[in-house]
């Protein structure tokens, strides 16, 4: 249901419902950037500069059971790719949107899913974005 997390009658997501789902599924969320600068006043990654990336190594350290990472959006995926390449035992490639790559990094096997951006600036219908997420959450 593409509208599952949308507030009824509104054009926004239901934060409480998302948190409830995340808790039940054992999901954690983080940004790939700790500090950013928007070069223009819009949601486009093209005008987003990462000033301080988040440390994936530090984020994963207290979560030894974490073996799946998901990125949404181009900038987040580019930043994660750079960190994975630095900490991987073999070359890492960018997954196709809606797909995953398996790799060894940070002393564990990881599955990295790259999903379509959830931003309204990304020109893909919510229904098509939901189709990609069905593969991640069968």
Spans of model-derived segments:
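Short, surface-exposed acidic-centric catalytic microdomains
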Residues: 1-48
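Short charge-dense sequence patches
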Residues: 2-12, 77-88
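Short, glycine/serine-rich, charged loops/turns that create anion-binding
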Residues: 34, 76, 119
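C-terminal capping/extension of enzyme domains
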Residues: 40-57, 82-138
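A generic secondary-structure signal
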Residues: 58-62
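Short, well-ordered beta-to-alpha junction loops that form the rim of enzyme active sites
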Residues: 71-77
């Amino acid at each position: 249901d593409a509208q599952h997390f949308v507030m009824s009658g509104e054009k926004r997501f239901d934060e409480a419902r998302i948190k409830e789902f995340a808790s039940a599924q054992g999901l954690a969320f983080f940004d790939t950037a700790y500090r950013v600068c928007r070069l223009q006043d819009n949601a486009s990654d093209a005008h987003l500069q990462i000033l301080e990336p988040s440390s994936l190594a530090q984020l994963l350290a207290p979560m030894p059971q974490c073996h799946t990472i998901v990125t949404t959006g181009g900038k987040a995926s580019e930043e994660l790719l750079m960190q994975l390449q630095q900490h991987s035992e073999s070359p890492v490639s960018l997954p196709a949107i809606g797909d995953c790559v398996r790799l060894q990094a940070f002393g564990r096997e990881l599955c990295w899913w790259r999903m379509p951006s959830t931003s309204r600036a990304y020109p893909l219908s919510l229904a098509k974005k939901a189709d990609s997420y069905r593969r991640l959450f069968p």
